[in-house]
């Protein structure tokens, strides 16, 4: 068993799983903070119910994200010790800031938010949530700074073959990091917004199905209520309609932000990692046309066997250079340039193990980069289109009484997740065979790079990594079941599941009051 390949599979599986939690935590957290802000400002119970319901789902996802994220730290030492030695001096600063500053604020103030209902003044309680959410946003920035340094090394000098940081500000303001961060944050907001849209659509459809809400001859909604179902009153309708329309509007805006930042990031990658982008386009030869569809053995070594079926003239040049005429270098031009710059064979060094002296294949796996790039764009476009459609269909105050359309909305929650995952896989797989990518122009440090083959721990066998992969897979599988059960349970239960007091309000609880002391623990886990 090849330790390198198994270690890569382990890192990919665990990181993709963790990355499912991250964008939802970022996007949903920001939206919940806005909801509570509206409640504090207006006192309207609709905003309180929204805060409690969506806050419950936010907490479930946050806790699972923390549990799955812990493994990422240990993997560097267990399976990637050589990589850790190489990048340790650089990674120390951003990861220390992430752990000691950002994550500290997240966990501490989120705890205050959970247990602070009806114990802290409203504005102080709101401030605890905003602090936790900002902590998450800052935490993501430091992680992306570390990852972006691997994509574009800056702020270091080589000392005895290892990069030593000499400018922390250059690392923190790496242009790759700033663009990637804005792109990631916009994608996270889109995920949170689609989450609101799909679940709210389900509850509005339930109200239509149960006959609580009807539609008059003009197509306008007639809002009803059911006294026998806790929480199914007129305010409940406003909760779901407001959540849906906020989700749809924010999703449209967020996807516009994703497209704008993605365009900037793409142009930067054409400068810094041209072979990644050439592989993403299956561009074997220099040219200006963008391949909408190519066929052939994308995973093979002979790029000339790839045939472009549908092409948009000039679009590739526009994506790379903002004009329609400048030729973009293809794979057949770039691979010889890489071979000349970084060698044709891996060095004869013990760090490479059995791979020492092997020929280097500089071409990323085109079937992954090509389709990953298109899945990222395709999922995003589908989700944005449905969000715009949702705004139109709900303009009269409810959703159509259509089960297929409801399931489409619920399934649409997965589209932004798919776009985020496809984008991450494309980004990471596209830099192979490097784990730290050499790109001295226009602002990188020449000579700072590391082949993936040199990054794996030399003292770990394939069998040991298989065992850890199986163990982590089992643990992650259990966590997936737990999260799915909790999410589905509270989604089906609606607002009443997050606010048990709706089922037994008495004189102590007016219609606009917050939860009483006895209800606080029902909100905690």
What residues fall within each predicted segment?
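Polytopic transmembrane helical bundles with strong interfacial aromatic enrichment
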Residues: 1-525
């Amino acid at each position: 068993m090849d330790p390198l390949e198994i270690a890569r599979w382990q890192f990919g599986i665990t990181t993709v799983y963790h990355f499912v939690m991250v964008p939802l935590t970022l996007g949903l957290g920001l939206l919940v903070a806005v909801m509570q802000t509206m409640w504090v400002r207006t006192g309207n119970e609709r905003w309180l119910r929204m805060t409690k319901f969506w806050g419950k789902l936010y907490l479930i996802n946050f806790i699972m994200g923390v549990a799955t994220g812990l493994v990422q730290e240990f993997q560097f030492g267990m399976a990637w010790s050589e990589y850790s030695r190489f990048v340790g001096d650089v990674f120390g600063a951003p990861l220390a800031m992430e752990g000691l500053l950002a994550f500290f604020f997240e966990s501490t103030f989120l705890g205050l938010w959970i247990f602070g209902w009806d114990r802290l003044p409203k504005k102080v309680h709101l401030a605890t949530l905003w602090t936790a959410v900002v902590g998450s946003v800052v935490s993501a920035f430091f992680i992306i700074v570390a990852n972006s340094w691997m994509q574009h090394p800056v702020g270091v000098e080589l000392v005895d073959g290892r990069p030593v940081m000499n400018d922390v500000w250059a690392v923190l303001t790496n242009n790759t990091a700033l663009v990637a961060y804005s792109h990631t944050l916009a994608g996270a907001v889109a995920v949170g917004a689609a989450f609101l849209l799909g679940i709210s659509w389900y509850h509005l459809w339930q109200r239509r199905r149960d006959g609580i809400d009807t539609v008059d001859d003009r197509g306008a909604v007639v809002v009803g209520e059911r006294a026998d179902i806790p929480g199914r009153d007129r305010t409940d309708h406003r909760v779901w309609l407001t959540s849906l329309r906020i989700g749809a509007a924010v999703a449209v805006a967020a996807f516009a932000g994703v497209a704008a930042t993605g365009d900037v990031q793409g142009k930067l990658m054409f400068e810094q990692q041209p072979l990644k982008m050439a592989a993403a386009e299956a561009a074997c030869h220099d040219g200006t046309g963008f391949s909408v569809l190519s066929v052939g053995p994308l995973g093979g070594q002979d790029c000339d066997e790839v045939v472009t079926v549908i092409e948009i003239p000039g679009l590739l040049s526009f994506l790379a250079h903002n004009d329609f005429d400048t030729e973009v270098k293809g794979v057949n031009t770039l691979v010889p340039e890489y071979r000349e710059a970084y060698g044709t064979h891996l060095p004869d060094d013990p760090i490479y193990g059995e791979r020492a002296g092997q020929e280097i294949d500089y071409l990323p796996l085109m079937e992954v980069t090509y389709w990953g790039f298109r899945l990222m764009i395709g999922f995003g476009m589908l989700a944005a289109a449905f969000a715009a459609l949702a705004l139109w269909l709900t303009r009269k105050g409810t959703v159509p009484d259509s089960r297929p359309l409801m399931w489409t909305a619920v399934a649409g929650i997965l589209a932004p997740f798919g776009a985020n995952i496809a984008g991450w896989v494309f980004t990471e797989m596209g830099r192979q065979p490097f784990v730290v990518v050499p790109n001295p122009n226009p602002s990188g440090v020449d000579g700072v790079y590391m082949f993936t083959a040199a990054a794996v721990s030399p003292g770990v066998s394939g069998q040991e990594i298989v065992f850890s992969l199986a163990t982590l897979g089992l643990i992650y599988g259990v966590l997936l079941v737990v999260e799915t059960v909790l999410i589905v349970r509270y989604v089906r239960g609606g607002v009443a599941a997050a606010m048990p007091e709706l089922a037994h309000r008495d004189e102590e609880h007016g219609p606009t009051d917050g939860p009483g002391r006895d209800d606080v623990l029902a909100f905690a886990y």
